């Protein structure tokens, strides 16, 4: 449509709200343009008027115009028609609601049946949800039999009435008629009058839609509202179809089959049926046909109208085409994955995209993508023509559409578009400013690259284009892991962003280097892989030497090489360089100590024999071989450290250069793996054969043992299970032993081993399978089962349990498998394939549900996490407000220390004579001893650390785990400070411990997750809640800071000087602020992906716990499904029962508890039951029992009359083992019989120590039944027997089928002296759950006992407990196979499921029952039902969520769309206009020849010039930030969140440019601050330009650009605001023309002769100046006086840090003029 209206610059209004409702018959008629009366579509080859393709409804012919709007086929959107139905019919979507309404109102007078005084009705009126309200009103009216009578005047409720009067049936003005029972059958509504005496009224009749319509029409509006139906939008009578709208032909297009015939759409067929049925009904009515024929015709019309809307009605035949294919109704068009909502609105096919196969190219940078030239010729980017690029655009247009780089279209300002393929006239290619040129994409353009399935955020990333020959996308190898791509034929998609805003977002948020560290598990997702990883290990070995020619070639592959060749490690006999030396050139300035994967822990730390300890100091690799642990995507790897210390750009360079250098070296060295690498020597092979044969013999012995019943069963397992487990143990051990002996035989230079140790491919299991033995094949976790007459294959004998016949493969892959081994191996492999296929679909659906449940959860600007309704999910993201990317594992040192250790580490024992020796300045010692205040401070500090420790142990981390992911790696910061300030660990520090304590206190107080304004809220509770949230957020980190920077440790362990310590404090603060999560971040989607992605890697099956207990545990995907579906019935319900401390350590006592809990019936302990006819109770016929029967009757029970006993005897023999195991006695069991049957049974039992345990039970006849016939006694006894066995509970808790005991020796406890130890406890696991009853057992520790049944926990313990249980269960499922997901993602899922106070399942029954908008709900599941409900109950959608906005094609309020940008119009008035250069001599840094760093990342726009440090209301778009300046691009510490910038890339404040720089001339005609890619370092900036010269007279520091009146350096400029630390209007020596002038530094002056460029302090012209230099210039683009954050890797300082001297902007730690002692102002924090 857009093509047919002239373009307007006016912004489109956003849709604020969507109101749903039902069209009334009048509305349908009014909007209709034609009444459809004929089923035919054509007449004489033309569309028939009044037919289904009436020309008024829109044309379907290219040559015709529409009769209604005169538009052509392309322009006319179509217009509705209508069909007048002869009789009203039910609408299938509304019929259930109509039925409910009929049950609420009187059949005769349409009054609401219930009375307004009724309590239940009043409660119903309070329900906000209209649908629920209707259901509640239906419940109120359910039991009404009569429409109550009464005068209208009594409607007003008289409050003076008494309760009794009120309770009487109130007369509410009904008609008094009897009400029928109303039911629905298929499409009919049936009324049934139950007790009608009148013969004239039929008891049961069909209620016609006409009659229903009349009833509904009479309903009053207020009654309607009471039922939840809003008469303004959806009256009840509109739910009956009287007029049917006919959709316009464009909705149901027809296709030409051949020249004459047309194929009509399904809807057109259906409408034709409706029209035919309607005509037939009209004809019958006209002819006065009998009622039953009319009813039949109506029913036929009803059927067609119903199947037109929904063709899947249960109980109705489907409407079909002639071919028998069911027609696609309106409902089928909307629902499901391919339907309108999900298929065409939520996800669409898009333009400007490409897809092809990917191949590898290690010479590309990780953020590049090689694009085939053919694709680059086809994809375009609309570039607006400006004076700066007009020449370039003309050149592109000259190249035309078929030559790259060229252009495809020109779009004029009025919107006309010229296709350059067909342009005839030269005048059409004329360009003016403001036109748009659709140019080909070119090197350096940013694109989005994606590989499906997009399981996590890193599946779509921004890349820069590199146009290359041939037809595949080229990709760096390191990027394959986040995409999960390989090069075996994978295809990937590329999308070209079309606006500057989008490009800016891609560059600032999505680029690959920014995604290196993933928030999912706070570790890198990209590392060095494949050849490079293998090469790196070989390259950094001790014996890797290179000659000069190779070194020179390698240096060529190092783009960042500074031109200095490192001195050779070996000079004689010839010069040789080591690999470590060259690798050091790549490593940025970091400090790191790590171990390789093959490190032996027994080695001494200082010296590693196998070179397995990696030491990097200041970027020099001093020792260690680099393998996957150091270079891979691991936590704490080099990549992780570089990313955190130096930012994404340095990290990108490191990965790129490692690949180019190492690959080049590896090509020269060569690497190959042949079959020879897998062949072991004969001695090893003999060893392997021996191992396997001995294992086979062991299995034989086991079989013999089992057959001779000499087998000890393990508790809870049968003989066969125990046997299988033992066999498995033996065989697996054999495989491992054989494998390890094969591995040990491999020499160091074995190529296979090289790959495995480097971590680039393969594992040790692969080696052992290739060389030694493939091992046992399993199906469903067991050995190959018997499938053919008690054997696995016909080739084996029956009942062969030996290794070979049950799937043990003793050959290696090298030797080859025998046929039967091959077959078993294939069985095992097939299972894996099936498993994967099943798993993929399941996890895909889980992920979709998770995303739909959490898609609208985001961080808001008050640091809370909320959904689109504004419900608070969390008060602070992850409870600490930190972004998952910025946390690293750190250990809290004080947690596990005992009291003596704690005192040694943290307490200042001032009075000891040797206090401070060797670590404190004697003057300071004296001061501390004599100053009571200091001593007080230090003692308080120790107490604080102690209280921290007890808080940690008792509340925060009772488990005693000291390693936690926390922001700001403190240990590394200390290391860096020691290196940076040259701290000698043997020297004493000049610090006063009290200063340390005070500084740390101030620092901790400043660490806030949100800069709180004074809360204006008067609400005490509100403020208290916020205070608690903020306190909790930083509590753990504060404890970490306090325990690490305790004054004694700073002085003894770290020996920091005052300067270094203050630097560290500043760094902590700035890094903490950088680690905060950004508002607008969609943490819900992130959490869903972080949980869904590992689920894809999960195993599907339930595994047995290896080991003793046979407790089954559901794990993997099925368990995850149970948790998020909140399954009522868990597959393996189980309790973990902890006992009270005195019981827990005693096995016998634990056994007693076990037997008390286990549910035991008589059947469990019975071995046999028999029924005898034994007529004489005193002398039994069973000889075995004679003894104890006689002894019983010697002392008979008085009450028992022998003669009343039945002659039939039930004799139960008990299983002695079970009875003793359950700790029962015969008396206990008899007691239970008496308890359940009283005196009607007589029970005699043998002694507990008798050989057999016997119960003898007889019936006792009561007085009344005496003497009656006893024939059926034995039958009765049989029934009693079965009842006793199954029902009679001896002891235990119902539901707990079995209890298993196990010990846990990892239970944390605090020892006597305050240390942290572990103790062993007996723990009970149950099969079956009954939490409440178990917890009430006196010996059970109810505080620790848990259940894995989530529904049970909420019933017993409530919502907070359930949240914790959910977290625990999710963590268990995910960590089972070694994955790790950061807590914050699991927490969001748990919070989303519980925040409403009840459990919300992640299914349609949970997600779709929340009060979100109908559009959002219908995009998940139950699409049509939800939309129908929305219409009936006239719901509104506020369009706040993600889905609604996407459906409406709007920018959703997320990420950069969650705020607006204002334009400061006053500043525009002051803006300078710039003289535009003549188009002819503009130079283009964008031409492919010149790869300027600035060009590589973006382009500019001509916004008014302004200062980059403005207030947020500044005249610039949000598109670009200051980080775009060429120097900031590699700015190590740049953080997108905190630095402001402007929409062009170059500013005068860029560190590469400075007024003192001789190479800049402000009057040069080809320089303009808004030049899109101007960079003074750009090689294409022509030095021969006449006005460009270092000595050029036109350069003058007072040029209008830097004059005091210049807006960018004027005293009113915000970058020199009076609050800026370096500005003081009264300072006599301050001059706005010298931005780097520092009044307090006498030795600093740009012209000072003693100032040398190699001086460690700052010089803008110095070649060695770099953003990573120790001093950071205040003119750097990411520095802003208002910005609390600074460069994370900058060794220099952050402006808000206390030691940053405000009067010394060019502070440098090594500057001799710096003295902190005088101008140290800790409180200089910008408000």
Swiss-Prot record:
One Pfam family of this chain: RNA_pol_Rpb1_7
Its EC number(s): 2.7.7.6
Compartment(s) of residence: Nucleus
Post-translational modification: The tandem heptapeptide repeats in the C-terminal domain (CTD) can be highly phosphorylated. The phosphorylation activates Pol II. Phosphorylation occurs mainly at residues 'Ser-2' and 'Ser-5' of the heptapeptide repeat. The phosphorylation state is believed to result from the balanced action of site-specific CTD kinases and phosphatase, and a 'CTD code' that specifies the position of Pol II within the transcription cycle has been proposed. Following transcription stress, the elongating form of RNA polymerase II (RNA pol IIo) is polyubiquitinated via 'Lys-63'-linkages on Lys-1266 at DNA damage sites without leading to degradation: ubiquitination promotes RNA pol IIo backtracking to allow access by the transcription-coupled nucleotide excision repair (TC-NER) machinery.
Cross-link (Glycyl lysine isopeptide (Lys-Gly) (interchain with G-Cter in ubiquitin)): 1266
Family stated for the protein in its record: Belongs to the RNA polymerase beta' chain family.
Domain notes from UniProt: The C-terminal domain (CTD) serves as a platform for assembly of factors that regulate transcription initiation, elongation, termination and mRNA processing.
Task of the protein: DNA-dependent RNA polymerase catalyzes the transcription of DNA into RNA using the four ribonucleoside triphosphates as substrates. Largest and catalytic component of RNA polymerase II which synthesizes mRNA precursors and many functional non-coding RNAs. Forms the polymerase active center together with the second largest subunit. Pol II is the central component of the basal RNA polymerase II transcription machinery. It is composed of mobile elements that move relative to each other.
Protein name (record): DNA-directed RNA polymerase II subunit rpb1
Gene source species: Dictyostelium discoideum
